[in-house]
């Protein structure tokens, strides 16, 4: 799998167009010969489905067309000179609180997409015009094609302030999109679809959205609907995104896929994030080696899952030395997400990037996804500019031509997400040699002590008598040597310590949770360990 170097890019894109003035309707512009023509009849999800079915019958146009020379070779510094003019924003006519800006083609974004805008099912495509952008010091040719298209778009809304215009959601590159809740800053991304992610043959395929229809509904609507047409060599698809802004903005997603050819590994509702440094893998990534003052660097710090039996599983993320893939049986899955639990500035010490404000994306199926696994892929990275974490639901049955796939889900942009359940939750994961400092006990290189801090739920009740607690553990390719629990008053919770002897050349899979008698008190902590990582 290829890492996606886009951290610097996406951070800079948020500055390409700030503030929105009085909106102008693009529908009134003269399109001219060759411009995309408006679709005057009422248009909806079924129309996108029909287009995806027709598209499936034809070969994929995998290679994007050549851009005009002035845009073909743009580096980042030149590309970011191209800024959308705020006064040209769309959707605001008629009093809507939503507004739309388009991204220009260039740099890494060379595949044009068509963006249609409208209300209540009546759409018109946005024609390309140099009037939409400020090009900085770039010298443009006298004529550019009116059907050039755009790289993507973003929608603004008064998310944090009734009089403001904050970025709500962005679609840019392949099938990537990101959205925000109140007082959040962009971090991880979602994708429309993942194909063959995590395979060692590096044969991952990146589907792309080729056309969008954005419906702001009426002026009083607090929802914007986005239809999207997906394409790739292996599959086509129709998507509907109903976006509702709020403290924890949500998106209801409906999908229908039409495979062109077999796909071995299909990833539904994929999430992509970055994890470079954290407290649980400092033995792997010595900050001194990177000359790094920040204690932690990550957009997400764990994978959270809710099983069919309402067990909550927390898997801390790590930056491994080599690619690692872990799969969790997930028949009847009720939810999963990549979370940024640690919301403390002190953990990151970054006054510009504010990792403590990165959102957590939580996915809940709203249809039957059938049998499958939640797959977590962790790639090695040497800095924070590369996305190295992928999580998705992978159905047990492969994708086959002639077999349509339909599914739906809800996505929410949360904070820490610890209030999703009322149990104790994992606060931190640490590791150390499995012996006390200065102890005469011999050191076994295959033995390691894992320490897990649990807080919340009813754990503070047991602070004065932790003997009432039992530690449930599980191990694969490893043996639990000893386990014990001690109070941690600093978090009003408990610290569980597990000494584990691992098998040579195998990945040890561990699990731990706290209970009192028959009553489970915490979510289940899960982890994968390679002894040669030490």
Regions found by a protein language model. Name each.
Residues 189-246, 367-386:
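Extended, loop-rich substrate-binding clefts of extracytoplasmic carbohydrate-active enzymes
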Residues 228-277:
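Acidic, contiguous internal or C-terminal segments within carbohydrate-active enzymes
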Residues 59-199:
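Solvent-exposed N-terminal domain segments of exported/luminal and surface proteins
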Residues 113, 224-226, 237-241, 251-253, ...:
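Hydrophobic residues positioned within well-ordered beta-strands of beta-sheet architectures
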Residues 77, 170-172, 177, 264, ...:
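A contiguous, surface-exposed recognition patch within enzymatic or periplasmic domains that forms
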Residues 24-32:
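Signal peptide processing junction and immediate N-terminal pro/mature segment
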Residues 31-76, 83-85, 353-534:
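Terminal accessory/anchoring regions of large secretory-pathway or extracellular enzymes
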Residues 1-17:
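N-terminal secretory signal peptides and thylakoid transit peptides that target proteins
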